[in-house]
Amino acid sequence: MPWRHVAARALGWVTTLPYRWRDNVHLGPRLLGNGRLRISGPGRVEFGADVNAWSHAEVNRLITTRPEAVIRIGRHARLNGCTIVAAERVEVGADCVLGSCELRDHLPYSESPVDRRRPGRAQPVVIEDNVWIGGQVSILPGVRIGHDTVVGIHAVVFDDIPPGVIVGGNPARVLRRLDSGASGDNRSE
């Protein structure tokens, strides 16, 4: 293994030390990080194997707001400055790439004018395997994004997205379907 890989693994191990002894955080093997990872809150955060949380500019923030909340990051996922906030559940599948986006399973306020001062209802967010989410994307509560999908920069996702498409815009809409042969990383493990 080249010395740079050894140094990156050592740095990843050292920078995740504050989380290695917390009961509510599970760090998968070979997690890469560079000190730009912040995990806070009383809920559970789980990383799969070979997750890369190596952000060059922005901090990766994983925040749980309730003890029963869960954030799961699948194997081989890459996080680059994303913010994930869970009151119930946010799942990111295997082989996903997340830019400086925001995923929330709840809003800090209710949509109803009558209940505006109360927190919104939590609805799970699920990102299936091999999804690429660009920068400045907002994924709102209750959304499921199908596998092998690309979400373009600055998109705001209100509704479920089918598998194998490229979406963009505000609100996000399907721009085109991806070729079935081009999708899927299909790493073996």
Describe these PLM feature segments:
Residues Y109, V114-D115, V143, R177-L178:
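Conserved catalytic-core motifs of eukaryotic protein kinase domains, centered on the activation segment
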Residues R116-E128:
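Glycine-rich NAD(P)-binding loop of Rossmann-like domains
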Residues M1-D105, V125-D129, V137, H147, ...:
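Domain-scale signature associated with acetyltransferase and cell-envelope carbohydrate enzymes
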Residues R144-I166:
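C-terminal/domain-terminus segments
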